Amino acid sequence: MIRVIFGYAIGILVSFVLGSIAGTQVVLASVQAMGLEVSWAARIEVSRADLLGLSATLLPIMALALAAGWGLYDGVISRMRSDRVTHAYALVGAGCILALHPLLALILGVDVFAPTRSLGGLLAQGIAGAAGGWCCGYIRSRSSK
């Protein structure tokens, strides 16, 4: 059970950190496209500030979506008496995050996370979900051996 919680926690944190940093870079690319200079020092500082700021809003929402998706996958796999597949966790993670942002926008009537307004920003979030899912799946698959 500890490995399950550890796998989920690591997967969620990886997804959040990568998603936050990617989202920050999408926004800063828009700023740069307007002709403003964005230094590497500014990119690092803004990324750090966004990680702290988004940890109170985006992190819990991502945690719920990812834990629900991975939990459902674990439940289905255990009933089928099949082996867990690491890349299946990555697909579930990507799917959860790719569905999360448009659903939040639909329900709330506003984009909760500005970088997901563009297809590139949304895909970057999906990749972050996949990376976190891969980490979760790797840890989970090690626990069944």
Q: Where are the model-predicted features located?
A:
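Juxtamembrane/disordered regions of integral membrane proteins
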Residues: 1-145
